[in-house]
């Protein structure tokens, strides 16, 4: 059985520490140290009012965030919980995913 950890972008009040360089590094390293197998980010390029009201202010670009976490860790697998395809050019999305 494998366990993954999802970036807590909508788990409560907005916390800017979770989206900065230091916060992402600490989060990824903590997930790896705790034994998680993967870290995930959800794609919400255009959040609606319901999403924002639930605290979804920290929706990072998943591929940029995953690349950052990959550079900070040594064994975590990377995943997107959602990649909203209609918002993205399919060729650029494929290249970003392949690069990460």
PLM features: residue spans?
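N-terminal beta1-alpha1-beta2 module of alpha/beta enzyme domains
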Residues: 1-72
């Amino acid at each position: 059985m494998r366990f993954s950890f999802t970036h807590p972008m909508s788990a409560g009040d907005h916390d800017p520490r979770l989206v900065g360089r230091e916060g992402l590094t600490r989060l990824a390293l903590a997930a790896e140290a705790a034994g998680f197998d993967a870290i995930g980010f959800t794609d919400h390029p255009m959040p609606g009012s319901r999403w924002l009201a639930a605290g979804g202010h920290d929706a990072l670009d998943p591929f940029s965030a995953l690349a950052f976490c990959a550079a900070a860790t040594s064994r975590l697998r990377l995943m997107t919980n959602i990649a909203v395809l209609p918002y993205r050019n399919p060729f650029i999305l494929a290249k970003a995913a392949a690069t990460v």
